[in-house]
From Swiss-Prot:
Pfam family, one: Pus10_N_euk
Source organism per UniProt: Drosophila melanogaster (Fruit fly)
Protein's gene: Pus10
Protein's name in the database: Putative tRNA pseudouridine synthase Pus10
Annotated residues for binding of substrate: Y378, Y451
Top enzyme class: isomerase
Amino acid sequence: MKNQDLVEYLRSCGVCEICQLRYLKARGAEYRNINETLQKLDVKLNENVENEELVISEGSQPSKRARLGVCSTCLGLFSKDFQNELLSSILASDFAKYDCQKIVLAICLPMSLQLRQLAMWFALRRRFGPSIDENNPPDVPIKEAVKLILHPIICEKLAKVYDANGLMINIDLTHSLEGEEVEKLVKLNKEAFPAKASHQKRIEISRGLLEKQYQPSKVKAETYEKYFQIPCSNVEESIKLTSIDLQGPLICVAGRYRKLSRELSHTPWILNGQRLMEDSIEEIIIRHVGPHFTEKLGKITFMSSGREDVDVRCLGKGRPFVLEIPNAKRSCLTKDEAFAMERAVDASGMVSIHHLQVVPREELTHIKTGEEQKKKFYRALCALQEPVSVKILEQLQISASFNIQQKTPIRVLHRRPLHTRPRTIYSVTAKVHRGNPKALIIDIVTQAGTYIKELVHGEFGRTTPSLSSIIGKPMDIQALDVVGIDLDWPHEVDNSKHKE
């Protein structure tokens, strides 16, 4: 089968030149200049119709040659008229409210398009015989062609970059014949697949069903032709744009926070409908970062690499955190903006943040996975009932790692199941507090997920061994700080060094 023969037949069936290229299996940029591509494929130009060039030339004069009617296979989906209508509708929507450089088109196509592709598949097999495979479509599928043809054009005209994680433009299309054709398809389905139809009380007609079940190897052309014309009939009306809905991207903003207060919960602390604390780390950060990206602060998800108790500070480099912001109105964060947010959070006096930045969603694996394999570094102020002896200090200089068995602490049983968890303690060092001979400052490196307070006092033998059992004396914890978290993420950025 020669390309010229194929194209001449397609022309006789009312197929537009862009769809002719689909049946010639054109790719990418080959759709941008139809004349050039047809000549390259040894196809003579049709001088009787205006080529449907995809590049919309500003200020160009319309051709006096006759235009094609509505394409019998794409129903005008790839026409200039539809491109112009689509662009105008996008610009007339809330598109300008989104400050996003990346976009993605999600186009819901009517099933009428799939039925026309199938009708042309049957027609080509009748005309060209075995050279048209009965299992593999003879064209570039409509959905793929949309990505190859429409996406680049829309992105170029909107001055945006295509990205699957960008602003999603949901486009719903329909055609006046779809309702009638779906009814016919239900009847066809019963005849083409009687065994399946007999076992189904209700037949679900879907695009997926058409893709999987309807091809010449599974449905006879004679059966199909009882309900639909082969090749597909010409139509007067083109495809219609029914709605455009915009959904902003999911933006992830990461950084590190330091918790400076011993009277601040990690997330809102509400019990029986009553707030137990006025504020939380989550609320302070979201309050100052969220409005840059969205008005719906309640939709933002706050995550961190672990958490502290209310009375525990987090110092050092801080704890990695991330905000997941759905349907964001903005996708970028300049250093100026990030620095202003950092200063606003710092002004709370309870939380400090730094290294604030937008990160790819894929990087959230750093927060979500392998949590228990991470190391955590703590400093605890502990009290004895007697002055610290040299022996006690020696017993608490532990450089070799050891394992403990730790039951779920009583204080968290209301939100954690009762389990005994093995945990690794990597090192312990201790020194006497300068101002109190009965007090110890103990530095501990542990596996993430270790309950440090219970590691110190043992909680009536529920943690074994404990530091108290190691020295053989009662010991309690007075204050605790997290001083380090073994997670090198997100990367360090100094937002204070921005251009004025």
